[in-house]
Design a protein with these regions (language model features):
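Leucine-rich solenoid repeat scaffolds
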Residues: 289, 293-299, 305-326
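Well-ordered beta-strand segments characteristic of repetitive beta-sheet solenoids
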Residues: 3-7, 24-29, 76-80, 102-103, ...
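Extended, compositionally simple hydrophobic/Ser/Thr-rich segments
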Residues: 76-77, 86-89, 96-102, 111-113, ...
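Beta-strand-rich extracellular passenger or scaffold domains
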Residues: 12-16, 33-39, 297-300, 322
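Beta-solenoid repeat scaffold
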Residues: 1-16, 42-53
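Short "repeat-start/strand-capping" segments in structured domains, especially the N-termini
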Residues: 1-3, 47, 70-75, 93-98, ...
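Extracellular beta-strand/beta-solenoid scaffold signature
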Residues: 17-42, 59-68, 82-90, 94, ...
């Protein structure tokens, strides 16, 4: 029948002392989000597996928190995963996932990991996802649609707190370079996404191979506080992205770095240099059909940029409209 695990007000703790997930949720849902695609046993016995009010702590280098396989309508609420490898790991196929009010904290892998998964409809909200070495929220080798990331604190997701060698990563890392991978219909809104630089790192990184027939697109990045990384927002090979109403600050390279992308609308953002050792600036390279409207870019110091880079750069771009920028 239906499954629920409740730790009674957060008092329960499970220590995972071996490799693999502390909890593996395995269903048989092979359909979509359409009610008619569900088998009868999925609708009656597998719906709404719920994990609530429990802590998982890893005591093994390959211990994970949770792994989801072919589930339907999974819910995580009030869950903490710490000192594991991956926090919540979604593989193969899942539908209609809700993650809220969780602490995915100080893990050696990824906080919320969408890895080689076919997943439509997932909401990640009102959670702290921080100090995870290989990224806060990471998508790789996956087909994902309808991803909402809203109201979270996503920060310090790199090697520094782990005293480990750096690897390129991001607080939100979307990689669609693998064969067959695609990510569309994504909202990133009302989050704090920060806070320490790392080599090759970004706060938001979205990347695609240039020859893809389905580039990452239909993205909205709105109303976030984004700061303190090598690149704050770094897009490669994207098509159809709106970036609006964000405060984006303190970069080692660029606040906004967009490569080989089309149909990008950037409006109402504040770009600034928050601390003396960081810089500020926006760069487009190999882009077309770009609207850059109503944004401010401020260096703030009398000494100017550390490497004297321009605040706004266009390289090999066409059909760019820049209006009402300060």
């Amino acid at each position: 029948g239906p499954l629920s695990i409740d730790g009674s007000g957060g008092s329960a703790k499970l220590v995972m002392a071996g490799p693999g997930p502390a909890f593996r949720l395995v269903g048989t849902h092979g359909g979509t989000g359409d009610p008619g695609s569900r088998k009868s046993n999925v609708a009656s016995h597998q719906r709404l597996p719920t994990i609530r009010n429990i802590e998982v702590e890893g005591a093994h280098a390959e211990a994970d928190g949770f792994e989801l396989v072919e589930t339907m309508q999974s819910v995580f609420e009030g869950v903490m995963v710490t000192r594991c490898r991956h926090g919540i790991h979604l593989i193969k196929r899942n539908r209609n996932v809700l993650i809220s009010h969780c602490h995915i904290y100080f893990n050696t892998g990824v906080g919320v990991y969408l890895n080689a998964v076919n997943l439509h409809q997932i909401n990640i909200a009102i959670s702290h996802i921080s100090y995870n070495r290989l990224g806060g929220i990471r998508l790789e080798r996956s087909e994902v649609r309808n991803l909402q990331i809203t109201g979270n604190d996503i920060e310090y997701n790199n090697h520094k707190s782990h005293v480990a060698k750096p690897e390129p990563t991001a607080e939100i890392y979307i990689d669609t370079t693998a064969e067959g991978a695609s990510v569309n219909e994504v909202t990133i809104a009302s989050n704090t996404i920060q806070a320490t630089g790392s080599p090759g790192g970004a706060n938001i990184r979205i990347m695609e191979k240039p020859d893809s027939s389905r580039p990452p697109g239909l993205f909205a990045v709105s109303g976030n506080i984004i700061g303190s990384q090598e690149n704050n927002v770094h897009l490669t090979g994207c098509y159809g992205v709106a970036i609006s109403g964000n405060t984006i600050y303190s970069c080692e390279h660029r606040n906004l770095f967009i490569e080989d992308s089309r149909l990008i609308n950037i409006s109402g953002n504040t770009f600034r240099r928050h601390t003396p050792r960081y810089g500020t600036g926006v760069r487009f390279t190999g882009c077309s059909d770009i609207a850059f409207t109503g944004c401010s870019i401020l260096d703030e110091t009398a000494e100017s940029q550390p490497d004297l880079t321009a605040l706004l750069e266009l390289d090999r771009c066409k059909r760019i409209n820049i209006t009402a920028a300060v």
